[in-house]
């Protein structure tokens, strides 16, 4: 292949600019499978990116606030999806124009990063990204230094985050937790109260999952279980491709404190599971080489439901976690310290549970088959260790183990009249649950976007090194008004008027209640936002926006023109 290519290249050089040279060059490019690139520079590059950012943000921002609208998304299969979830809308958007798509993809990156860190705030992050990047493009076009703008933006964000932390207040009561959940669920009180009840049942550190219900109503079910902070070792173990999870019903559980590398030991355990016609979960330090290959081949070719998960923790903490798991599931830890090895595993050494759900990040074990008395004794041992420990780190790890062992798992079963309704409600419940966890973690600030609005006033005092940095600070100052403006506009009110009224007065708890069309004390009215959500949305939006503002060239692939299908030959004996 390479000799042929070299020969063609030589012919191309000899042919000069002739038609033959062009043909040979074309054949050479084809032989190496090159994809042609298009390069955009400066103002043109940023303008095209901005169009992608604006169109995506405009589709997302209509969902913001209690009077935000739904977005209907066509799907390649099944019924259209109806949602008010910002990150779902953002993920569904692709543009034909490659450069526009670069801008849209970077906004998706902001939404995904905010969603991964805080679990909510994706719409706010998207709206802020558009506002910052729009002003940044104008400033660069006017001759400002892009790097100084970026420094000014960074300084302003740091100052705002410090100000927000000063506003924050911690929450503890069930009523406050319900308020946070209600706001994030677009004002649906029932969802907020359901989340508050779930946290009461399993504790703030407990595990709460969301599932489809079988009725028209939302239900709360608490199941004794444990969550491990490790996911599947290989994606080949996935059984539910839509959810990207491995789900095992009534599995046997092998628990080992060392690496599993021996293929023969794995085959023996697989035979036990096959004989009992049950799935198999392996929890070990690691599963490598032949052993992992054997499991994957049996999963793909023989259809045996199996999954391997790395044991959570390190050192002594890992051993303790495995012992907790063994007691919860009624099994034993296969450990060489007690003279045990995988070759001598017997069926009674394997644990069991009702269901296991494994994602790429974690494993939830529901309704373990362990003895209740043994589980309670183990929990008492951990409580005693917490009381006697003098190390804050050890106490934290012990309390985590106690929550996993005795807290159980709360399952929020979401009901509805149709699959589309259940899907839309699940999106809102997921947002509400994530926001509630964030609020418990870092505290709350007045909601409805007013925390960012009032923080913008403090930027007047910020000192900068030069004029361009000052413009960067002003970009953030203007962007911080956007969430309140958008929420008011979606409620059918003039956003600029609402922003102006709030900035004129001095009460930082006063805000605009879009649901009731009135100005209220946001905290007393229960309209609150988790600090973590607001902080993450601002930091992520500013980071990506300032990167886009300093972009000077974009390289994208030129789409290949597909050759038309060959014409069908005529059939003999037919007249046309």
Swiss-Prot record:
Q: Which GO terms describe its cellular component?
A: mitochondrion
Q: Transit peptide: where?
A: 1-34
A Pfam short name: Cpn60_TCP1
Name used for this protein in its record = Chaperonin CPN60-2, mitochondrial
PROSITE patterns according to UniProt:
CHAPERONINS_CPN60 (PS00296)
Listed HAMAP family: CH60 (MF_00600)
Per its UniProt record, what InterPro entries does this chain match? Chaperonin_Cpn60_CS, Cpn60/GroEL, Cpn60/GroEL/TCP-1, GroEL-like_apical_dom_sf, GROEL-like_equatorial_sf, TCP-1-like_intermed_sf
Name the Gene Ontology molecular function terms of this record: ATP binding; ATP-dependent protein folding chaperone
Sorted alphabetically, which keywords does the UniProt record give? ATP-binding, Chaperone, Mitochondrion, Nucleotide-binding, Stress response, Transit peptide
Report the induction information.
Answer: By heat shock.
Q: Which family does it belong to?
A: Belongs to the chaperonin (HSP60) family.
């Amino acid at each position: 292949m390479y000799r042929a290519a070299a020969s063609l290249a030589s012919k191309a050089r000899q042919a000069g600019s002739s038609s033959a040279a062009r043909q040979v060059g074309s054949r050479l490019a084809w032989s190496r499978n090159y994809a042609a690139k298009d390069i955009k520079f400066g103002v043109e590059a940023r303008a095209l990116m901005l169009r992608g950012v604006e169109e995506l943000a405009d589709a997302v921002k209509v969902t913001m606030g209690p009077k935000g609208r739904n977005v209907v998304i066509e799907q390649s299969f099944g019924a259209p999806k109806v949602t008010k979830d910002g990150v779902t809308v953002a993920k569904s958007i692709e543009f034909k124009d490659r450069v526009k798509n670069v801008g849209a993809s970077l906004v998706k990156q902001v939404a995904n990063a905010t969603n991964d860190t805080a679990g909510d705030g994706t719409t706010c992050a998207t709206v802020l990204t558009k506002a910052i990047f729009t002003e940044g493009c104008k400033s660069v076009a006017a001759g400002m230094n892009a790097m100084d703008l970026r420094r000014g933006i960074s300084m302003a964000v740091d100052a705002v985050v410090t100000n927000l932390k000063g506003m924050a207040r911690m929450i503890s009561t069930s009523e406050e937790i319900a308020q946070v959940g209600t706001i994030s669920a677009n004002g649906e009180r029932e969802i907020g109260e359901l989340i508050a009840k779930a946290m009461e049942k399993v504790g703030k550190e407990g595990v709460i999952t969301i599932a489809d219900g079988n009725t028209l109503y939302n239900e709360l079910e608490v199941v004794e279980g444990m969550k491990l902070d490790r996911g599947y070792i290989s994606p080949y173990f996935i059984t539910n491709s839509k959810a990207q999870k491995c789900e095992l019903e009534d599995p046997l559980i092998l628990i080992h404190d060392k690496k599993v590398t021996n293929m023969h030991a794995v085959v023996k355990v697989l035979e036990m599971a096959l004989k009992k016609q049950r799935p198999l979960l392996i929890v070990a330090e690691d599963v490598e080489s032949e052993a992992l290959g054997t499991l994957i081949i049996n999963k793909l070719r023989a259809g045996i439901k199996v999954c391997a998960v790395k044991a959570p923790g390190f050192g002594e903490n890992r051993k303790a976690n495995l012992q907790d798991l063994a007691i919860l599931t009624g099994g034993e830890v296969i450990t060489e310290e007690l003279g045990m090895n995988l070759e001598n595993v017997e069926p009674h050494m394997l644990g069991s549970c009702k269901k296991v759900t494994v994602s790429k990040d974690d494993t939830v074990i529901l309704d373990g088959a362990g003895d209740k008395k043994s589980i309670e004794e183990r929990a008492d041992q951990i409580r005693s260790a917490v009381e006697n420990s003098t190390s804050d780190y050890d106490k934290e790890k012990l309390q985590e183990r106690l929550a996993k062992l005795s807290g159980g798992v709360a399952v929020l079963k979401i009901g509805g009249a149709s699959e589309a309704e259940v899907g839309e409600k699940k999106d809102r419940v997921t947002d509400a649950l994530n926001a509630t966890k964030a609020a418990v973690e870092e505290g709350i600030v007045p909601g409805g976007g007013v925390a960012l609005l009032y923080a913008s006033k403090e930027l007047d005092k910020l000192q900068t090194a030069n004029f361009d940095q000052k413009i960067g600070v002003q970009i953030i100052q203007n962007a911080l008004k956007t969430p309140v403006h958008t929420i008011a506009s979606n409620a059918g009110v003039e956003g600029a008027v609402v922003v102006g009224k709030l900035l004129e007065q001095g009460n930082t708890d006063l805000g605009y209640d879009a649901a009731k069309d009135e100005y209220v004390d946001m905290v007393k009215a229960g309209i609150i936002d988790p600090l973590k959500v607001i902080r993450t949305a601002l930091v992520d939006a500013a980071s990506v926006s300032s990167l886009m503002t300093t972009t000077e060239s974009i390289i994208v692939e030129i789409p290949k023109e597909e050759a038309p299908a060959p014409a069908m030959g005529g059939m003999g004996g037919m007249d046309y």
